[in-house]
Amino acid sequence: MDSASVLQHPRRNLGSRHRSQADRFVKLAKQDPSRESENLAWAEQNAQQAVLFDFTDERNWRCLAIVKKMRNDGEGLALVLEDLFIVLGRDHVQLSQLKGVNHLDVGLELLEAAFITDSLDPENWFSSLEGDDLENFTNRCRRLDFTDQRANIIYGRRLERIRIAGHEDLFIDLVQHLLAHRPANHELWMELGRLHERRNEIDQAWLCYDHVQQLRPTDKVRD
């Protein structure tokens, strides 16, 4: 795994630690107006690190967005939302809707609306599905660009939740789209291989395990 991949792989403990630090500096900024600017600068730095280390935790995004608003940084808040939409796999039409919006007024509302309809947590996301949502998700997976590793990871976890719910054929179908955009996703190759093995599709299973072995030579997937 290269250095960029390491940075983009979720590290929950570090994310939580930096978010706690950001929260502490926000409290200090509120308590001491004379040092508000300095403390908010530290809060923003830690909030950015929290998102960097764990983009899968909605609290980290919320923390960063709140600090941006407290600093009256509408442009910065717009960039936070744009980055979040990329992670959520939103298409270009939805991204274009962010243009011309007063983000200081509605930025936090847009953030919360995104989490309600498109939670980063795979369990919350799956439990919110109703009606034609699964079909819409399927169509979405087939047309979106998943070259951003963060989006690839988020959608990979959603597909795993779909597989657990019994939609194995749908998992096998859609996972191909994610792997086509990001063939270095060893976790998805491993899950796909295990599924093929459970289904007694041995040739397909070994093809997946071969990919894992090439990506992570130290893993003894063939044993």
Residue ranges and their predicted role:
Residues 1-28, 32-35, 79-173, 203-206, ...:
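Intrinsically disordered, low-complexity, charge-biased linker/tail regions
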Residues 39-50, 137-141, 171-178:
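Amphipathic alpha-helices of TPR/Sel1-like and other helical repeat/solenoid scaffolds
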Residues 42, 49, 83, 174-177, ...:
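The canonical alpha-helical register within tetratricopeptide repeats
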Residues 56-57, 183-186, 217-221:
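Short coil/turn motifs that N-cap or connect alpha-helices
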Residues 68, 162-163, 196:
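The core hydrophobic/aromatic register in alpha-helical repeat solenoids, strongest
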